[in-house]
Amino acid sequence: MKRTFQPSTIKRARTHGFRARMATKNGRQVLSRRRAKGRKRLTV
């Protein structure tokens, strides 16, 4: 049986990366929440 997690750095960055977050209004909200919480890393 094929495993569900097939890691790919490019796909990871394109879906969860900084530019992907900045592209939408909700993504920017995610970043602001993470900044407010004091996360060391905002995105992957």
UniProtKB/Swiss-Prot annotation:
Signal peptide as annotated in the record: none
GO cellular component, one term: ribosome
GO MF term list: structural constituent of ribosome
InterPro entries tied to this protein: Ribosomal_bL34, Ribosomal_bL34_CS
Disulfide bond entries: none
Record field: compositional bias (Basic residues): 31-44
This protein's record includes keyword Mitochondrion: no
Top-level lineage group: Bacteria
Membrane-crossing residue ranges in chain numbering: none
Keyword annotations of the record: Ribonucleoprotein, Ribosomal protein
Keyword set includes Lipid biosynthesis: no
A Pfam family hit: Ribosomal_L34
GO biological process: translation
Disordered: annotated span: 24-44
Annotated family: Belongs to the bacterial ribosomal protein bL34 family.
Name this protein carries in UniProt: Large ribosomal subunit protein bL34
Species, as recorded: Stutzerimonas stutzeri (strain A1501) (Pseudomonas stutzeri)
Lineage start: Bacteria, Pseudomonadati, Pseudomonadota, Gammaproteobacteria, Pseudomonadales
